[in-house]
Structures are given as structure tokens and as C-alpha cells.
Amino acid sequence: TYDMQSPCVSVRSGWVAVGDYNGNLIYDISQDGTSKQIDTNLPVKSLSVAANGVVAAILEDGDVTWINVYNPTGEKAVGIKTTMQKSGYPVSVSLSDNGKLMMVAYLKAESGSMKSIVSFYNFDEVGQNYTDTMVSSYEYSDTVIPLAEFTGTHTAYSVGNNQFMLYEGNEIPKNIFQNFMQEEVQDVRSSGNYVAFIFN
């Protein structure tokens, strides 16, 4: 049993990652019941698990926010340093099914208005040729994107307060679809290649 006040939970195939919001521990649990405890040493703000047990977490560290990636043994494999001034504040993180790609939605203030940035990271060979393994990035002015999520190994979506985007790519994901919405989205659900919206 796990005693948590405000749990963050991510489920993918046969894996579940769970950690207390602002807590320092993440439990990476496989379908057969084995569990690995990950000590982040920093408060957890959000997390995501891949279908192979790889875990990504957004961690608060004062003026710096870290996005760390841990392998199923609990060891840190990647650490990405972000600041509000340079990259913006990461509000959502998601791993592809195979754990090789990661998408992050950032919120950034610029010239008195807010914009969102959706960035993709490639932890495979292709990503080694890019700074911080960031292989593609897309900006959306006057938009707040609280949700960015992979739906497989190479397909993903993001939802903002006024628009919806689709992305695709095995190595360098591209924004293949963008649609502005007139109604306010109340909830979003995804399954495989399908995304469903509930409007107010």
C-alpha cells in the first residue's frame, strides 16, 4: 500500500507509475506486481510512464525545473534543465510507448502575453546530434496547453484552451494537424489512435 495525499498516476500497457504531488518518491509498478522505488530528491510535479517501464518526471528545484528520465531499474538516464526565462515552465510530459521519444508542453510569458511550446526529445541515436536531444519544437501564441500526450510510439496530440494539434514521426515528430476550437473543452480521453473531446 502507498500513503499519498495527492497522487500523480500514469498508466501505459503493463506499467503504472505513481507518485505523490510534491513528494520525492515514484513507484514504478509492472503488471506482474514487481515494484521499483525511484527517489527523485526533488518535488514531483508531473510524471509519465512508457510501455517498457521508463519513467519521466517534472521536478521542481527553485528557479530551475528538471525533467528527469529513469529506466525501469530506477536509475536516472537523462536530466534536462529548464528555466522560465529560457525554455518556459514545463506543465505536461509524456513518453512514447517505447520510451525513446518524449514530448513536453511548456508555458512561457513573452511581451505581456502567454504562449505555449511543445517540444520533442529523442533519446536514440538521432537525438545525439541535437542540443539537449530536442529534435523538434512548435510554438503557439496566446494559447495555454495543459495537456500533451503520446498515443503510441510515433503519434501524439496536445490540447490548448483554443486549439488541438496532432503530431507524427518515428524520429523527429512533426505537427501534422492543427484545429482551432470555438467551444471550451471540459475533458479529453484517448485510446490508441483516437482522441475524444467532451465540451461544456
Language-model segments: residues:
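A short beta-strand motif characteristic of beta-propeller blades
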Residues: 1, 32-39, 76-83, 128-139, ...
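Post-signal peptide N-terminal segment of secreted/secretory-pathway proteins
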Residues: 1-42
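Repeated scaffold domains used in trafficking and secretory/extracellular systems
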Residues: 2-13, 42-51, 86-95, 137-151, ...
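Hydrophobic beta-strand positions that form the internal "hydrophobic ladder"
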Residues: 16, 54-56, 99-102, 155-156, ...
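Residue-level marker for isolated small/hydroxyl-bearing positions within beta-strands
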Residues: 19, 57-60, 104-105, 157-159, ...
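Structural motif
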Residues: 24-28, 63-69, 110-122, 161-168, ...
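Short loop/turn segments immediately following beta-strands, especially the blade-tip
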Residues: 122-128
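Intrinsically disordered, low-complexity segments enriched in Gly and acidic/Ser/Thr residues
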Residues: 160-200
